[in-house]
Curated annotation (Swiss-Prot):
GO terms for cellular component: endosome; ESCRT III complex. This is pH-response regulator protein palA/RIM20. Belongs to the palA/RIM20 family. Keywords: Coiled coil. Residues 4-397 form the BRO1 domain. Residues 256-312 form a coiled coil. The lineage of its organism: Eukaryota, Fungi, Dikarya, Ascomycota, Pezizomycotina. Residues 829-839 have a biased composition (Polar residues). Residues 763-847 are annotated as: Disordered. The keyword Disulfide bond does not apply. Residues 772-795 have a biased composition (Pro residues). Pfam families: ALIX_LYPXL_bnd, BRO1. One of its GO terms (biological process) is regulation of secondary metabolite biosynthetic process. It comes from Emericella nidulans (strain FGSC A4 / ATCC 38163 / CBS 112.46 / NRRL 194 / M139).
Length: 847
């Protein structure tokens, strides 16, 4: 059946076994058996089947949809979004509604259910009897709730889907549908105002707001790939229709206030708006077209009458459209989602209106997040304060040996010819690893990861800067008295702090990267020798003449060799201890402790979503198990100090006892340079691995930062839009003047449906008792208003529209005024003149 309003169609789905996927996930990811939740698994499938079968506009469908949606929100705290089942849903809009879109995403399922809830409310409004004031109130309320549900879907659910929304759930489509629903809600309020007989000026303001809503809906619809052209034509026609209705009602107000020139101007604009709307006549239904034709007929008739009166009687100048004051808006509707949608989880419980939460005994998903957080902290403790410290001490020990030319000085003395076996082994290791090329390739890979991290971070920072600029511009535009929300940095201090911290990470990391590249550049020549052949090594290391070692030198050599062997044993022992700590951390499973703590929290704080931050005390307790390893690091540092002192003493004694010739010194220098080169190679590899891990971890941080910024900016822009609307509404309501008028007893209550065209017209004039004879205008004789000045009343009070009248002022006898009209005839007394008025139907006669 054709109608002058639209209803949102349902999205359709078919049956899938959600319980099967949940069973599989519980059995593989949790420490609990799926059969413990057999009843819950049956219930969740039943709830889904009931929800997807809501395809008719009946109020019973509301409870089915909100109950299933609440359970889906609850499951979001127990399971990840990709639980393992493809949810198929057929689009409600677009050019391919016969092919379903499927996603393994609980949030996608929730979005479709919430969309259908909004569609249900819109269809309930469509089905309401809108010929009565009660029906109009109910329809208006349904439309507002449908718009609120779509706003909740757009701002709270779709951004958390972690996947691209369907084509008919994108930003522009949802915004268009929201504005359309608000337009139809405002239209219901406007229609009720007409039925209640409000003042023409008030009805004009209401109609103007209806036109604005339809205009916004159309603007967003043309940017959507899903809204059909028929709907766009409908919105366009309604936008111009209500612009015409607003001007028509304002013209009636001008007529009442004797602004005859402005009346003509507004009627002309109303005709122009109607003609603009009629350009869509090929694509709109007969009901909308009939309303337009009825309005056009009414406006055209009034325009002819007004132009004739003004041209022949009043002679008021007709202002151009540009000089007409814009009609104030009166927005009487707002998007408001039901509490069962916005506060669904709080309504789940043993006695909650939405039933008992399912899978309440299942370990919450937040527990797994907490386990991940603990693992990160434990690994940071182990890697930085234990393993990292041990490696730093070892590096310092190697630096000491290198500064003392050890073991090169001993090797040059003990083996004056050929290559030491340790050097040959080191060179072979580097050749097998393709040492120099490996280092260069690793640095290039790290540079790519760093570039990606920087791009993601820059995107987040630019979004923050853009939002701050928008907020500052709005604050300058509206002033701090009206733009009362927090400044950007005050609204999101953590985001700005995180941005500065990440920038600091990049700065410090760049210094480290430059240092590693400098190390590679300085040691590149030695690396080429070490990765070459043994002949290259022999050519690099000069031989020295064989000499007899004196006993005193032999004694110092033996002592120094013993110290170096102790250093090697210390390094080996450290590697074993570091590996033991790594194994300990790998076996450190906090899951069971988290489950016990989660059960305690659920008992003490029922219906409160468990957050990972609630496990802080448990984290601290478990990390204290590594205090013994921290003590071991301190002991290792003490032992190293002693060994370093012994090495220094032994080397000083060896240096005093051993002088050596020039060839020995050259061989000693070459061997030490190669030994240092190998150690530098191992050091650079370690640095590269640290850098690789750093930038990979930083990728997660900057990605999370960018996502948080996107969510914050989206929320702030929604707040700004709402605040601007509130400011505009306050200004419009301040100028809104609505008051009750006494209705003559002859007027009857309208019982027939009020169409758009009929509602835009003026109620028929009532009968009046004549006053004393007086010159009348050429239209109809209407006495001046005698009612007292009405007082403003709330909008909910039924009102009647005043009859459009022209007040007739007292006229001085013998003096012409525009209200007297044009009269021809012989002169006479004032009394005679008052009875001889001109009849337009008789033409002009001269005597």
């Amino acid at each position: 059946m054709a109608s002058n309003i639209l209803q949102i169609p349902f999205r359709r789905s078919h049956t899938v076994s959600l319980s099967t996927a949940l069973t599989q996930y519980i059995s593989t990811k949790y420490d609990q058996r799926p059969d413990m939740f057999a009843d819950d698994l049956l219930i969740i499938d039943r709830l889904r089947n009931e929800a997807i079968n809501v395809q008719e506009p009946h109020v019973s469908g509301i409870s089915r949809l909100v109950t299933y949606a609440a359970q889906l929100k609850w499951l979001g705290g127990k399971f990840p979004v990709d639980v393992g089942v493809e949810f198929p849903w057929y689009p409600a809009f677009g050019f391919n509604t016969s092919r379903p879109v499927s996603q393994d995403n609980i949030r996608f399922e929730l979005a479709n259910v919430i969309f259908n809830l909004a569609a249900l409310y819109s269809q309930l409004a469509f089905a309401v009897n809108r010929t009565t004031t009660d029906g109009l109130k109910q329809a208006c309320n349904y439309f507002c709730q449908a718009a609120g549900i779509l706003a909740h879907l757009r701002t709270d659910i779709v951004p958390d889907m972690r996947s691209a929304p369907p084509e008919d759930m994108d930003e522009m489509t949802l915004r268009s549908l929201e504005e359309l629903l608000l337009a139809q809600a405002q239209e219901c309020f406007w229609q009720k105002a007409v039925m209640d007989g409000l003042k023409d000026a008030s009805i004009a303001r209401l109609a103007g707001q209806v036109s604005d809503f339809y205009g916004d809906a159309c603007d967003h619809a043309v940017k959507s790939n899903a809204i059909s052209p028929e709907w766009i034509h409908h919105m366009t026609a309604k936008q111009h229709h209500f612009a015409a209705a607003a001007q028509y009602r304002q013209s009636l107000d001008c007529l009442e206030k004797r602004k005859y020139g402005e009346e003509v101007a507004r009627l002309r604009d109303a005709v122009a708006c109607v003609n603009e709307a009629l350009k869509e006549s090929r694509w709109i239904n007969r009901t909308v077209l009939g309303d337009l034709q009825g309005l056009k007929n009414r406006v055209t008739e009034d325009l002819k009458r007004a132009e004739k009166d003004n041209d022949m009687i009043y002679l008021n100048p007709v202002p151009p459209k540009s000089e007409l004051k814009l009609i104030d808006r009166a927005c009487m509707v707002a998007a408001k989602a039901p509490s069962q949608v916005t506060d669904a989880i709080s309504m789940l419980g043993e006695k909650g209106p939405l039933g008992q939460p399912l899978f309440s005994k299942l370990v919450p998903y937040a527990v797994h997040i907490a386990a991940s957080i603990y693992s990160d902290r434990r690994d940071r403790l182990v890697n930085e304060r234990i393993i990292g410290e041990l490696e730093n001490m070892t590096d310092k020990l190697r630096d000491l040996l290198s500064s003392l030319n050890l073991p090169g000085s001993l090797q040059a003395l003990e083996k004056p010819l050929g290559l030491p076996p340790s050097l040959v082994a080191h060179a072979e290791e580097m050749r097998q690893q393709d040492g120099l090329n490996r280092l260069r390739k690793s640095l290039l890979d790290i540079a790519k990861v760093k570039s990606n991290d920087r791009a993601v971070y820059t995107e987040g920072v630019e979004l923050l800067a853009a939002e701050k600029a928008e907020d500052d511009a709005s604050r300058r535009k509206f002033g701090t008295d009206r733009w009362t929300r927090e400044a950007s940095e005050a609204a999101a201090p953590k985001l700005y702090t995180t941005a500065r911290e990440i920038d600091g990470y990049f700065t410090s990391a760049q210094s480290s990267d430059n240092l590693v590249e400098q190390k590679l550049h300085d040691s590149e020549a030695v690396f080429r020798v070490l990765t070459g052949t043994n002949r290259d090594l022999e050519a690099f290391v000069p031989s020295s003449r064989r000499a007899t070692i004196p006993p005193e030198v032999e004694r110092e050599v033996s002592r120094l060799r013993s110290c170096i062997s102790e250093v090697n044993r210390l390094e080996s022992r450290r590697k074993r201890k570091a590996q033991a700590v790594k194994d300990k951390a790998r076996a450190d499973d906090i899951s069971s402790a988290l489950v016990r703590e989660a059960a305690r929290l659920e008992r003490e704080f029922p219906m409160q979503a468990i957050q990972a931050s609630q496990f802080e005390d448990l984290f601290e307790s478990r990390l204290r198990d590594y205090d013994v390893d921290l003590d071991m690091v301190a002991q290792e540092m003490h032992d190293q100090d002693q060994i370093v002192a012994q090495v220094r003493d032994a080397n000083r004694a060896f240096t005093r006892a051993h002088t050596g010739d020039a060839s020995t010194k050259e061989r000693e220098k070459a061997l030490q340079e190669l030994e240092n080169g190998y150690l530098k190679y191992k050091e650079i590899i370690s640095n590269i691995e640290v850098g690789r891990k750093f930038y990979n971890d930083l990728a997660k941080i900057v990605g999370r930062f960018r996502d948080d910024v996107k969510a914050f900016v989206h929320k702030r822009r929604m707040e700004a839009s709402q605040l601007e609307q509130d400011i505009s509404s306050v200004a419009a309501m301040a100028s809104l003047n609505i008051s009750p008028i006494r209705q003559p007893p002859q007027q009857t209550v309208v019982s027939a449906p009020v169409s758009v065209s009929a509602a835009a017209s003026v109620p028929a004039p009532t009968h009046f008792n004549p006053v004393k004879p007086q010159p009348q205008p050429p239209s109809q004789a209407i006495p001046p208003q005698s009612q007292p000045q009405p007082q403003p009343q709330p909008l909910r009070t039924p009102l009647t529209a005043p009859q459009p009248t022209r007040s007739v002022p007292q006229v001085t006898p013998g003096m012409w005024s525009p209200e007297m009209g044009i009269r021809f005839g012989p002169g006479g007394t004032t009394a005679q003149q008052s009875q001889q008025t001109w009849d337009p139907s008789k033409g002009m006669k001269f005597s």
